[in-house]
Amino acid sequence: MLDKLQSIKEKHLDLEQLLSDPNAAADQVRFRKLNKEYSDLREIVQAYDLYAATKTELDESRQLLKSESDAEMKELVQAEISELQKKLPELEQQLKILLLPKEEADSRNVIIEIRAGTGGEEAALFAADLTRMYQRYAEHQGWQCETLHFNESSVPGGFREITLSVNGHDVYGTMKYESGVHRVQRVPDTETQGRIHTSAVSVAVLPEAEEVDVEIRREDLRFDTYRSGGKGGQNVNKVETAVRITHMPTGIVSACQEQRSQLQNKERAMQMLRTKLYDIQLAEQQQQRADLRRSMVTTGDRSAKIRTYNYPQSRVTDHRIAFTSHALPQILQGDLQDIINALKMHDQAARLQAELV
């Protein structure tokens, strides 16, 4: 491991020299690639430097303990050695995690599909609650969140389905743990007996595909146009600006109605279709690996109930890792970081174990 870390540090220094060259920015594509590689290695190098400095300090303290004759001084040095011995394995574990291979899709932007499941109107209202939760979390992260498509329910404020686009730094690597079935337990406003109802909403987080990822043949597509609904300008319900694309071989459908023109909606719908096909391709690759990374946390198995939101007890439970929080209002306001951090740690532990097998 230490040889690998030293090699990474040397690579980081080489990249730093290349980026400091005044001519480096002339080729913007190459410059961005080098800069990303440099940024990706920075955290590993900083952790390695801290590990190396701690190890050096420990060695020096041990030497000092051997040569020291003063009893009080020896006691101080021994206390320092004990502290450093405790710190070193923690730093080593951190380095092992940082050296784990990154998932290629983690740096991608995402498409989030939220669909009301069992529970009727309550499920539709909870789909809207989850939508706001993700929009606020994206805002906290400094990401850009955009609504691409929605299908309102009969109850005001609810969604049968809604699709979001989220752009930013390492969005998929952060949001992929949200894929699955989210269950809510609460008393509906229309419930006169005070009984708790259980509803469910499915969430699919898809890494956004690039044009080079998926080959789509024009003859495999069917294009339909229709009038957009909901809020809008003069074109609403007058001009067919909304676009629906069907991929005939798979039956996958994507639609967009939020852009102003039919051309813009067509481009966004094509991007969504590409993303859905890429997700299938990615899932097939993951299936072939069939290792511990296929745990529920990493795959976001959409047939599984991953989380329960219990309103009477103000409790959120993630069933994959037995995580429980009694901060339901804050979580619904987008404060998801504690849950996501816990899921990431569980994922990293599973992947480290897989590396040892």
UniProtKB/Swiss-Prot annotation:
Is Transmembrane helix included in the keywords of this UniProt record?
no
Where, subcellularly, is it found?
Answer: Cytoplasm
Q: Which GO terms describe its cellular component?
A: cytoplasm
The record's InterPro entries line, in alphabetical order, gives: PCRF, Pep_chain_release_fac_I, Pep_chain_release_fac_I_sf, Prokaryotic/Mito_RF, RF-1
How is the protein altered post-translationally, as described in the entry? Methylated by PrmC. Methylation increases the termination efficiency of RF1.
Pfam families for this protein: PCRF (PF03462), RF-1 (PF00472)
Q: Which residues carry this modification: N5-methylglutamine?
A: Q234
Q: Which molecular function GO terms apply here? A: translation release factor activity, codon specific
Output the SMART domains linked to this UniProt entry.
PCRF
Q: What does this protein do?
A: Peptide chain release factor 1 directs the termination of translation in response to the peptide chain termination codons UAG and UAA.
User: Which NCBIfam families would you find in this protein's record?
Assistant: prfA, PRK00591.1
Family, as annotated: Belongs to the prokaryotic/mitochondrial release factor family.
Question: Any idea what this protein is called?
Answer: Peptide chain release factor 1
